[in-house]
Amino acid sequence: MSKAEKVALYTKMARIRHFEQRCIRVYQQGKIGGFLHLYVGQEAVAAGTISLLGKDDHVITGYRDHGHALMVGMGMNECMAELTGKATGCSKGKGGSMHYFAPDKNFWGGHGIVGGQAPLGTGLAYAVKYLGRKG
């Protein structure tokens, strides 16, 4: 891995951490209702895995989905809008922390049930193969 690639990955991890730290502050201000499942300490997982995916690949994850969402290209403002219940959020402000969603980026969300993404991911993979699509 080149130095430039290492710096790029570190920058992505730092971006995720920055977002999560902002989430903590906004949550402490009482602007985020419900649960807030943070990704602090797991930044390398999303940065490392998603950086290896192609544009046709799909991502589905569990309830700690902020890092994955940012790595697939969702904007910080869109993600924060979802957390604060605004209509400009990725799930129109109704999904909150566990239910980010961006079909235009092949991001099929986080899921509030532990392990719930496994059968959904299996079905997604089957559909991609069955329909002859890339991914």
Predicted regions and their residues:
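Charged, compositionally biased N-terminal leader segments and the immediate start
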Residues: 1-7
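Cofactor-binding active-site loop characterized by glycine-rich and histidine/acidic residues
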Residues: 21-25, 29-135
